[in-house]
Structures are given as C-alpha cells and as structure tokens.
C-alpha cells in the first residue's frame, strides 16, 4: 500500500514528478508525484 503526504518544502505549481520526488527525498520520503491540482505529494510504502 502507498501512503501520500503533501510536501512541506515544495514551492509553486507541481509540473514535474522528478522535481517533486527530489524535494521529497530531502523530506525523507523515497519518492513523490504531482497530483491533479498541481501539488506535490510525497509517497512511501506503509
């Protein structure tokens, strides 16, 4: 199962999953993706 948490450090509109994921790495998440509302969500297995 995958858990999602909105990124605390990501600024601006999320248009690149890669950008989002690299910010999430600094928040101790293994990855991240943009959602439909252009926000960055960090993901991890839970």
Curated annotation (Swiss-Prot):
One of its GO terms (biological process) is defense response to fungus. InterPro entries: Defensin_plant, Scorpion_toxin-like, Scorpion_toxin-like_sf. Keywords: Antimicrobial, Disulfide bond, Fungicide, Plant defense. Disulfide bonds join 3-46, 14-34, 20-40, 24-42. It holds the Pfam family Gamma-thionin. PROSITE patterns: GAMMA_THIONIN. Belongs to the DEFL family. Plant defense peptide. This is Defensin Tk-AMP-D5.
